[in-house]
From Swiss-Prot:
This is Small protein MntS. It is found in: Cytoplasm. GO terms for biological process: cellular response to manganese ion; intracellular manganese ion homeostasis. Its main location: cytoplasm. The gene is mntS. Keywords: Cytoplasm. GO terms for cellular component: cytoplasm. It comes from the Bacteria. Required for repression of mntH by MntR. May function as a chaperone that makes manganese more available by delivering it to the necessary cellular locations when manganese is limiting. Induction: Repressed by MntR in response to manganese.
Length: 42
């Protein structure tokens, strides 16, 4: 939980461009996870 708070602190102090980059990375991870977890669907 402390790591999460630290991440949020860094996130809140980071510039807007960095926030967008982190959000896009997070979205990519979320979008790629189901495809990797269920290869039998394809």
């Amino acid at each position: 939980m402390n790591e999460f708070k630290r991440c949020m602190r860094v996130f809140s102090h980071s510039p807007f461009k960095v926030r967008l980059m982190l959000l896009s990375m997070l979205c990519d991870m979320v979008n790629n996870k189901p495809q990797q977890d269920k290869p039998s669907d394809k």
